[in-house]
């Protein structure tokens, strides 16, 4: 009886070398589960070029490896970013930073319904903000401005002019320090759901009779999806949206 090969653990996955993405320009590109499905379907189509098949495989491997490294760096039990998780919710967006044609950073965002404590009334209010769900830059590339490049690109692509309107899922002390240094965000009330919403998140808001937080119309309001006016780059039959050169 043949023995089944041992399952690859997240630790081993995190130790893998990130593959070279020769068809992905250096800079920031945006991917969703639907984009990855389209890339997979194109790769499986009869007559697909070997380079296209190679791109799909290496891009998915890059996402899984960086997601595993993020999990390891944060010392958490569950992986936050993987191809499988992106396919589970196609509304989530993954911003991938590549340098020298290799992935060096990821930033995952998506809209979620949350109940958070209002810092003034101390009562629970319902909100549906754009959330930062995972943020990681490879250790070998930290303190070189890549994190700011990735975060700034995401804010622009998501039409967020005020970073304080985002909710942050379980931020590490390093991420809190990053937000304090670059965006002056510091004061917040701890939430039972482990999301961080800064006190300035509640600026220019009111609470409805049903307890829903209402934000005054503003350019700072995050759109669920970037506008079609943003640049796209065709890559192997799929589109890397909102690409910004490195």
From Swiss-Prot:
Keyword terms: Acyltransferase, Transferase
Marked site: Crucial for catalytic activity: 74
Which residues constitute the signal peptide according to the record?
none
GO cellular component entries: ciliary plasm; cytoplasm; microtubule; nuclear lumen
Catalysed reaction, written as an equation: L-lysyl-[alpha-tubulin] + acetyl-CoA = N(6)-acetyl-L-lysyl-[alpha-tubulin] + CoA + H(+)
Domain N-acetyltransferase per the UniProt entry, residue ranges: 21-202
Q: E.C. number, please?
A: 2.3.1.108
Q: Name one GO biological process term.
A: regulation of microtubule cytoskeleton organization
Family under the similarity heading? Belongs to the acetyltransferase ATAT1 family.
Quote the protein name from its UniProt record.
Alpha-tubulin N-acetyltransferase
């Amino acid at each position: 009886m043949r023995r089944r090969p041992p399952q690859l653990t997240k630790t081993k996955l995190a130790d893998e070398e990130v593959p070279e993405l020769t068809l992905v320009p250096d800079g920031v590109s945006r991917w969703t589960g639907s984009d990855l499905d389209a890339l997979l379907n194109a790769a499986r189509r009869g007559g697909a070029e070997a380079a296209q098949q190679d791109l799909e495989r290496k891009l998915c491997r890059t996402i899984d490896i960086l997601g595993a490294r993020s999990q390891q760096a944060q010392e958490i039990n569950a992986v936050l970013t993987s191809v499988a998780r992106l396919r589970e919710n196609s509304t989530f967006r993954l911003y991938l930073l590549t340098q020298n044609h290799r992935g060096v950073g990821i930033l995952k965002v998506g809209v979620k319904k949350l109940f958070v404590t209002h810092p003034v009334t101390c009562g629970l209010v319902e909100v549906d903000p754009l959330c930062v769900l995972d943020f990681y830059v490879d250790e070998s590339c930290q303190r070189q401005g890549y994190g700011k490049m990735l975060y700034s690109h995401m804010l622009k692509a998501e039409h967020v002019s005020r970073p304080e309107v985002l909710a942050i899922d379980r931020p590490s002390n390093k991420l809190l320090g990053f937000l304090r240094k670059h965006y002056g965000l510091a004061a917040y009330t701890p939430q039972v759901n482990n999301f961080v919403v800064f006190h300035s998140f509640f600026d220019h808001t009111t609470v409805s009779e049903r307890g829903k937080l209402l934000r005054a119309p503003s350019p700072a309001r995050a759109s669920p999806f970037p506008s079609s006016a943003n640049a796209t780059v065709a890559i192997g039959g799929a589109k890397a949206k909102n690409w910004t050169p490195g």
